């Protein structure tokens, strides 16, 4: 599931990279992103860093913005800033690229975000202590959840996000999904090549994760449903 810069040569279009990735939860090193930038100087490279605050120091591509006119880094308030309902985000790029974006914006939609979302976003940026405590708590619970899955024989990728991407050791992922759903526990499964054997598990509170593991232990021991 790792990012290979060679795959992004000569595409002839703008390039969008989710880093950390969803749904795999993996983080590509900034050196790999920089290699893509250098190989595509005439293409805009958009790096979606929705989950980067859960990845630790040095994960963001923001420091590269000053060196690359074709780099646009986008962020959201929906994850680490706890404002999913506000539909709020921002982007960072060099002045010329931002000016181009504004021209496109004003050509079809001159309206900005609503006042309540703007106020909530400003308040979230000011409360750095709450942000850091929240991220630290999620990362701590993530580590415990990953250990719990590995103890049960699951393959768990090293997550840089607020979720885990894991493969069950015995039963098909789709069956585990349905068994958990019967127990009113919801996770995600993507019926697509390469990842249909994997499950995406969001990190909740410690109590919520215990509820997940209780249901999982039942689900893994349940007889397959008749078809």
Task: State where each predicted segment sits.
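Conserved PLP-binding catalytic core of the aspartate aminotransferase-like
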Residues: 138-139, 151-183, 199
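PLP-dependent aminotransferase class I/II
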Residues: 70-150, 154-157
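Structural motif
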Residues: 14-18, 46, 90-92
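Short beta-strand-to-loop capping motifs
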Residues: 93, 166-170, 203-205
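PLP-dependent enzyme catalytic core of the Aspartate aminotransferase-like
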Residues: 31, 178-183, 187-188, 192-227
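Short acidic/glycine-enriched loop/turn segments that link adjacent beta-strands
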Residues: 85, 160, 194-197
